Amino acid sequence: MSKRTTYCGLVTESLLDQEVTLKGWVHNRRDLGGLIFVDLRDREGYVQIVFNPDFSEEALKTAETVRSEYVVEVKGLVKKRDPQTVNPKIATGQVEVQVSEINIINKSETPPFAINEENQNVDENIRLKYRYLDLRRQELAQTFKMRHQTTRSIRQYLDKEGFFDIETPVLTKSTPEGARDYLVPSRVHDGEFYALPQSPQIFKQLLMISGFDKYYQIVKCFRDEDLRADRQPEFTQVDIEMSFVDQEDVMDMGEEMLQNVVKDVKDVEIPRPFPRMTYNEAMERYGSDKPDTRFEMELINVSELGEEMDFKVFKDAVNNDGQVKAIVAKGAADQYTRKDIDALTEFVNIYGAKGLAWVKVVDDGLSGPIARFFETTHIEKLQSLTNAESGDLVLFVADKPNVVAQSLGALRLKLARELDLIDESKLNFLWVTDWPLLEYDEDLKRYTAAHHPFTAPKQEDIEKLDSEPENAQANAYDVVLNGYELGGGSIRIHNGELQAKMFEVLGFTEEQAQEQFGFLLDAFKYGAPPHGGIALGLDRLVMLLTGRTNLRDTIAFPKTASATCLLTDAPSEVSENQLEELSLRIRH
C-alpha cells in the first residue's frame, strides 16, 4: 500500500472526494450486518471509515476480522456523512472514508482497559503499568501535544531574544542545595560519587562568568524528596540566566515569555504587568507564599477583638505574641453543620492549630458556641472588620502567626473547593517578591537559605548579615499561577567576599565552603558580571495549562508516589558483578 497521505484526525471536508491512505489503530468497530463501521485513530484524533461490499467485498471480509487496537492501513475516498450520522463533537464528524483496501499491519490482544472510553475509572497503577496504552487515549495525546507546543513556544521566544541553548553536566558534584541528591557511584574512582543535578544553578552562573550573557536550557533535574501530587523525583525545568540585569529585567522577560506561551498554546491574552505582592503581604492576606487569587476569602486580622473580648482563647493568643485571624465563607452558614465544622477543625489540626472557633451570622446577631462572648460592640466590630452579613460563616484561628497563616491558608483552599468558588477557566499569574533571605531551622539550630545559597540579599540589607540575618530580604521573586509556584528566581551574588559571607551565615566553615564550592569562589576572582535568572517548572506549567490536577499526567513515563516506575519495575536490584565493579556492598 502507498505512503500515508494524512492523519486520521485531519480528514475533513477539505478532502472531499479525494483518495486518502490512513494508518492507525482500531478505536471502535460496529458490525451492522453487511456494513462495518470503524473509528480509526492516530495521535491527531479519529475518523469514521466504512466497509461496504459495494466498495470492496475483499476489504469488508478483512474488516470482519479486525478488533480493537489492531494496527491497520486503509485506502479509500473521503465522502460526506449522511446528515443523520454527522458527529459535531469531533473535527472529522462531517465526513467518512469509504474503504477500498485494508491491510492488517499488526494484531492486538484485548487491552487491560478500554482505550476508547475517556472517563472510565481505571486504577492509576494499571494505567502506569501499561503506560504505552494509556498514552493512546486522546485526552493524554492532547496533553502531550500541548506540552510540545509549550516547549516550542518557549524556544522560539528565547531564541528571538538572543538566548543561547547550552547543555550543562548531568553527572556533577554533590552539593548541599536543599533536597537529598541522587548519587551515582564512580567505577573509575573507587569510593567516590557523582550526583544528578537538582538544578543547573552553579553551572549557569559559571556560564555568565564565561561571558555568554543569555543562557537557557530545558533540562531534567533530580531531587530525592518526599513526593506529592505536584512533585516527581525527576522533573523538567525551563532554566534561564542573564547578565547585566536587575530584578525588573528578569521579571519583565518572564512575563513576556509566559504571555507568549499562553497566547500560542491556548489563544488566550494574559494581561501584563502581572499583579505583584510582597512575601509578607501574601502571608498576611492569603496565608500562603503562593496564593490562589481566583477567589476572595482573604484572611482578616481581628486581633483587636481578642484584646477586647472576654474569650480566653483569643486573649491568650494575643497576649503571647500571637494573633487572631478570620475567614468568611459567604452565604455558607446553612451549608455547614456542627459535624461538618468538627471535620474542618480536624483539618486545621494537621497544620498545628489547636482549634477552630466559629460563628454564624444571623439576622439578630450571631449563633454558635462562642457567640455568647460577643457583646453588641464586638459584633459591630466583627462585621466592620470582615464585612460579614447574615448567612455567612466566620471561622477563626488564634495562635502563633505562622500557625494561623498555614492553617487558615489551607482551610481557605479547602472551603473554596467545597463551595465551588474557583473559576477553573482563569489563569491568574502573580509575582511574589521581597522574600526573606534566610530561614531558621529549629532542628539544625542554624539558618538555611530560603531559596538557595547563591541568592543576593537586597543591597541595603547586606550589613544585616552580621547583626540581624533573620531580617535580611532577598533579591528574589517567585511567579505563581492559580495557587501553584510556577517558578522562582533571583539576582545572584557575583562577589566572592559576599558569597563567602553567605556561606558563613549558613554555618559553613571556611574549609567546608572551599571544599564544596571552591570552584565557584575561584571563578568570582576573574571578573564576574552581575547576573540573575529564573527557573520554571515545565511539567507544572503544562499541568495548569491543560487543566490537569496531577503532574503525572503531563510526564510521558512518570514515577508513582513512591518513586517507582511500574512499567519498567525501576528501581530494581542489580547483579553482584555490577556491585563488585563499583566496590559496593548492600547492607540489609
UniProtKB/Swiss-Prot annotation:
Highest taxon of source: Bacteria
Function: Catalyzes the attachment of L-aspartate to tRNA(Asp) in a two-step reaction: L-aspartate is first activated by ATP to form Asp-AMP and then transferred to the acceptor end of tRNA(Asp).
This protein's encoding gene: aspS
Lineage: Bacteria, Bacillati, Bacillota, Bacilli, Bacillales
UniProtKB keywords: Aminoacyl-tRNA synthetase, ATP-binding, Cytoplasm, Ligase, Nucleotide-binding, Protein biosynthesis
The reaction(s) this protein catalyses: tRNA(Asp) + L-aspartate + ATP = L-aspartyl-tRNA(Asp) + AMP + diphosphate
Stated name of the protein: Aspartate--tRNA ligase
Protein family according to the UniProt entry: Belongs to the class-II aminoacyl-tRNA synthetase family. Type 1 subfamily.
Cited HAMAP family: Asp_tRNA_synth_type1
Keyword Cytoplasm: yes
